[in-house]
């Protein structure tokens, strides 16, 4: 049984995540390794309520700020050429990528 690499992507822009997933799929097709995914994981919503008025006087009106964190999961066979090309993918600043080798 060959070793697997689990790639976890997280970011605030789903379009950027889909672009990186397409790059990973293209690398898998070029090198001929098996690919499973991308699996969309549940989106986390981080919400911060804040008062509109800075001095605390007047009516209590609130603004709600939110940030959504989208996640994707990809399993790929851990071929040396494929992993080297995975490391060379240009990743935007708002996307984090984590690669874990599994048996």
From Swiss-Prot:
Residues 35-59 are annotated as: Disordered. InterPro entries: Ribosomal_uS10, Ribosomal_uS10_CS, Ribosomal_uS10_dom, Ribosomal_uS10_dom_sf, Ribosomal_uS10_euk/arc. Disulfide bonds: none annotated. Keywords: Ribonucleoprotein, Ribosomal protein. GO terms for cellular component: small ribosomal subunit. PANTHER family: 30S RIBOSOMAL PROTEIN S10 FAMILY MEMBER. Involved in the binding of tRNA to the ribosomes. This is Small ribosomal subunit protein uS10. It comes from Haloarcula marismortui (strain ATCC 43049 / DSM 3752 / JCM 8966 / VKM B-1809) (Halobacterium marismortui). The gene is rps10.
